[in-house]
């Protein structure tokens, strides 16, 4: 019998990729919701939804992800990234459902010189990172057997993201300045969706925190250069700049590369190199 999977935030980048990877998979019966169908910041709405649906798995793709705006919208950011996670976890626990939560590399302060492991000390330097870490803690207090994926620099053909922005700017601007002293790894949302499917399809449930991004490491500047190279954009001069030269409201980690060893070992899985996934995504965007 097909297992029912509740996907929240279904209209976002990851939610849309989950639609595609679940399409035609007879082992799962997905329920896709966004704020119109289910307001996850309302405990009553969640409780009513669970009372009316049998749920085996919850995959929470909903979040407040506007990192700079979060500095001025602490309450809303907290409601979506922490309180809502707790409400979903409480409902999942009462109804015997398993839960997958998406978190972020921004739970770290970026002072490491090696890729971050799951047990490294967390120390977020932004409201966004702090609320995502609060969400992790609230989830594990309520549902210790949950799965948490910390990911980074998410992009896809859907919604607003860095890749689509740089494609647009590359075609409309003569020059661009992009930060070169923040290093991390981009994550193609499709790759993360497939990783979540590996969790759901596994013969046994492997709870815990996992780091997931594509393979490799790169700066925002070099990422932009790669986006333009792959898309054949030659009319825009991309210049490197420092974080100090481009101040933002929220502080960001200078180094947030994630160590994916635990995920790869646990699920016997390989992860694509960031440039291969970027090429596929740009292909999808350009051929829509």
Give the label of every model feature segment:
Residues 219-225, 242-281, 285-288:
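Conserved C-terminal active-site "lid" loop/helix of NAD(P)H-dependent oxidoreductases
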Residues 8, 33, 58-62, 99-104, ...:
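SDR active-site strand-loop-helix element
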Residues 31-42:
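Rossmann-fold cofactor-recognition segment
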Residues 43-80, 91-93:
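NAD(P)H-binding glycine-rich loop region in Rossmannoid oxidoreductase-like domains
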Residues 79, 84-87, 94, 107-149, ...:
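Catalytic helix-loop patch of NAD(P)-dependent Rossmann-fold dehydrogenases
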Residues 137-184, 190-191, 197, 227:
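NAD(P)-dependent short-chain dehydrogenase/reductase
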Residues 3-23:
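N-terminal Rossmann NAD(P)H-binding glycine-rich loop of SDR-like oxidoreductase domains
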Residues 13, 202-249:
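Mid/C-terminal beta-alpha module of Rossmann-like enzyme folds, strongest
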């Amino acid at each position: 019998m097909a297992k029912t999977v509740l996907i929240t935030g279904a209209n976002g980048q990851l939610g849309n990729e989950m639609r595609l990877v679940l399409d035609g998979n007879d082992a799962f019966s997905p329920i896709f919701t966004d704020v119109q169908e289910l307001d996850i910041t309302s405990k009553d709405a969640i409780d009513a939804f669970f009372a009316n649906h049998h749920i085996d798995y919850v995959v929470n793709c909903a979040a407040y992800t506007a990192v700079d705006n979060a500095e001025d919208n602490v309450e809303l950011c907290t409601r979506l990234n922490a309180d809502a996670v707790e409400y979903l976890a409480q409902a999942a626990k009462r109804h015997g459902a398993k839960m997958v939560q998406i978190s972020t590399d921004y739970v770290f302060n970026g002072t490491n010189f090696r890729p971050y492991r799951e047990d490294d000390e967390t120390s977020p330097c932004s409201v966004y990172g702090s609320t995502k870490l609060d969400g992790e803690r609230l989830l594990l207090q309520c549902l210790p057997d949950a799965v948490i994926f910390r990911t980074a620099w998410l992009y896809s053909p859907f919604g607003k993201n860095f890749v689509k922005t740089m494609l647009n700017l590359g075609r409309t601007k003569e020059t661009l300045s992009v930060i070169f002293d923040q290093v991390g790894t981009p994550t193609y949302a499709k790759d993360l969706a497939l990783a979540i499917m590996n969790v759901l399809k596994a013969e046994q449930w492997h709870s815990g925190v996992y780091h997931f991004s594509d393979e490799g490491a790169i700066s925002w500047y070099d990422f932009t250069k790669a986006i333009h190279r792959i898309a054949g954009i030659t009319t825009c001069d991309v210049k490197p700049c420092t974080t100090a030269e481009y101040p933002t409201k929220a502080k960001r980690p200078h180094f947030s590369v994630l160590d994916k060893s635990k995920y790869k070992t646990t699920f016997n899985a390989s992860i694509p190199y960031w440039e291969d996934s970027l090429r596929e995504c740009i292909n999808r965007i350009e051929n829509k």
